[in-house]
């Protein structure tokens, strides 16, 4: 065991990384100034460059609209990315797939696809119409979440840098876990399935394939120790 003091220090450093991110310009700015306001300004500049490139790919602005809604979509706890929420109802599915393909190829996002039947292997059972999007850099994700507000209104910075783990930051941690899993060479999958009453769904945040085994991952942002989805998944696929 590392001990509580070491664990607290490591988690504090990790949350600082979540706030700054890994973009070289943002890291350099933090090392030079130790000022998150300056870091946030740098990250806003990077996002502007991204959106300029998105506009060159699609002058209707729809790729930017997809990208901009990622934090709101993750924070809503929806079981999939809602294209209509980002673009409205008038975009046909073929055009949507093209826009998403261009966004994915830009390497600015990570995508997790729903595995309809993890028992037969995730790549064999993915649902290409059911997916989630994550921003590829945790620091850009946090800036993007408050892109239209002033730095001082971005409460995520305050929550991350306090020693109190906040249960409402689950989606922020989910995004950084997606980044870490992708950086380690994993393809991202997730899984939802109905509860025994059928009124709600369990959701396993990520699934990894290891040989003939499926490894479920549930992301928690606070000291909350219950993990009903993980327990139900293990029971469902224990045989």
Where in the sequence are the language-model features?
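Generic structural signal for secondary-structure transition and capping sites
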Residues: 22-23, 75, 108, 186
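Interdomain motor-coupling "hinge/lid" segment immediately C-terminal to the ATP-binding subdomain
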Residues: 1-72
């Amino acid at each position: 065991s590392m001990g509580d003091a070491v664990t607290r220090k490591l988690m504090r450093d990790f949350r600082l990384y979540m706030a700054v991110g890994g973009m070289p310009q943002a890291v350099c700015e933090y090392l030079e100034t130790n000022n998150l306001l300056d870091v946030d300004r740098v990250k806003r500049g990077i996002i502007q460059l991204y959106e300029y490139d998105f506009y060159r790919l699609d002058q209707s602005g729809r790729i930017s609209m997809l990208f901009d809604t990622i934090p709101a979509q993750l924070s809503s706890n929806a079981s999939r990315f809602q294209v209509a929420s980002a673009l409205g109802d008038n975009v046909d599915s073929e055009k949507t797939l093209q826009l998403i393909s261009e966004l994915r190829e830009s390497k600015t996002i990570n995508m997790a696809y729903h595995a309809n039947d993890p028992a037969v292997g995730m790549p064999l059972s993915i649902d290409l119409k059911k997916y989630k999007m994550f921003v590829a850099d945790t620091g850009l994700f946090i800036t993007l979440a408050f892109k239209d507000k002033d730095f001082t209104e971005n409460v995520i910075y305050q929550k991350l840098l306090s020693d109190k783990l906040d249960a409402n930051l689950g989606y922020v941690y989910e995004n950084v876990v997606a980044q870490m899993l992708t950086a380690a060479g994993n393809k991202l999958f997730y899984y939802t399935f109905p509860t025994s009453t059928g009124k709600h769904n369990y959701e396993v945040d990520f699934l990894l394939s290891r040989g003939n085994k499926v490894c479920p991952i549930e992301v928690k942002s606070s000291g909350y120790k219950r993990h009903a989805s993980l327990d139900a998944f293990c029971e469902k696929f224990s045989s």
